[in-house]
Amino acid sequence: SDLQIAVTKVVDSLARQLIADAEGHSKIISITTVNAKSERDAVEIGRACARNNLLKCALHGEDPNWGRILAAIGTTNAVLDPHNIDVTLNGVKVCEASSPGQSRDLVNMKSELIEIVIDLHIGSAMATIWTNDLTADYVHENSAYAT
């Protein structure tokens, strides 16, 4: 419905603003899971990636490490075929059918926005999760004070 579309746009905008205001970040990361069996699976995969400190550190270091994305996906209970997952980073399909795809060197990791698309090829559900990278500034800001 029109109302649902309007509310979704507002909520998405608010989520982006929260991420952009996060202390010590250098990257804003969009993780979209498509063709999942259910929206629940798509959200679970996005959240697993968003919470993965190794992935967040790699993205801060501008390393398009799709293996860390697959590793995060592997921690979920989502329905998937582990041999048929595609990962696209900033428009470059670096992983196709869970194997190396296009060259990682083609991925522009310099921009503040990093867009990850995970294609499960198993259904029609999708979800987008927003997060940011893990930086030394973030660690410092959150460890340099007494509570």
Where are these regions (language model features)?
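Unusually extended, aromatic-enriched hydrophobic runs near protein termini
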Residues: 1-6, 78-82
